[in-house]
C-alpha cells in the first residue's frame, strides 16, 4: 500500500468532499485522516490516504484532474517519534500583526513543536473589537516543562490568556 499526503484547494462548492472521497474510493483508496476548512470562499483540505501500489498513479491523475482544484501530493514520510507527549493549548488576546509568528516562536524557544494550529478572530463581548483566538497542539519531550511554555506565551503580552491541557 502507498500512503499519500495531499493538500487540496479551490473555490468551495457543494459536493466537493463527496467528489474527493468518491475519487479515492474508485481507486481502492482508504481515507485515513483529514483536516478541512472553508476560508475566504475557498475549500482547503489536508488529507492522508492509502491505496494499492498499482492504483497510485491513476489515483494521482484522477485527483489532479478534478475541476477547479489544485492538488499537491507527497508520499508519507515516516519518522521516529522524538516527542512522545502532546499538550493542547489555547491563547486568547487582542489581535495584532505578527501574533502567529510570536506565538510559534515562543513555542519553539520553549522546546515544543507545533503540530496543529487553528486561529480565528472573534467579536469581543462589550469591547467593540476583534480578539485573536488560537488553539492547537504542541509535541514535546517527556520531561518538558509545561510552566516554561506558559511563561513564554504569557510574556508575549499582558492581554493574552493562556491555557494548557494534557
What are these model-derived regions, one by one?
Residues 1-166:
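A conserved regulatory-domain signal marking ACT and ACT-like small-molecule sensing domains
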Amino acid at each position: 500500500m502507498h500512503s499519500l499526503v495531499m493538500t487540496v484547494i479551490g473555490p468551495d462548492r457543494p459536493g466537493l468532499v463527496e467528489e474527493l472521497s468518491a475519487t479515492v474510493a474508485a481507486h481502492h483508496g482508504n481515507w485515513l485522516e483529514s483536516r478541512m476548512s472553508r476560508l475566504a470562499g475557498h475549500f482547503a483540505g489536508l488529507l492522508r490516504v492509502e491505496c494499492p501500489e498499482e492504483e497510485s498513479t491513476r489515483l494521482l491523475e484522477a485527483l489532479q484532474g478534478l475541476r477547479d482544484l489544485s492538488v499537491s501530493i507527497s508520499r508519507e514520510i515516516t519518522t521516529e517519534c522524538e516527542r512522545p507527549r502532546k499538550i493542547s493549548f489555547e491563547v486568547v488576546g487582542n489581535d495584532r500583526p505578527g501574533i502567529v509568528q510570536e506565538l510559534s516562536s515562543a513555542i519553539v524557544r520553549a522546546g515544543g513543536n507545533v503540530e496543529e494550529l487553528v486561529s480565528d478572530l472573534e467579536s469581543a463581548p462589550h469591547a467593540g473589537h476583534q480578539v485573536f483566538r488560537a488553539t492547537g497542539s504542541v509535541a514535546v519531550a517527556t520531561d518538558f516543562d509545561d510552566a516554561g511554555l506558559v511563561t513564554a506565551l504569557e510574556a508575549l503580552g499582558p492581554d493574552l490568556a493562556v491555557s494548557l491541557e494534557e
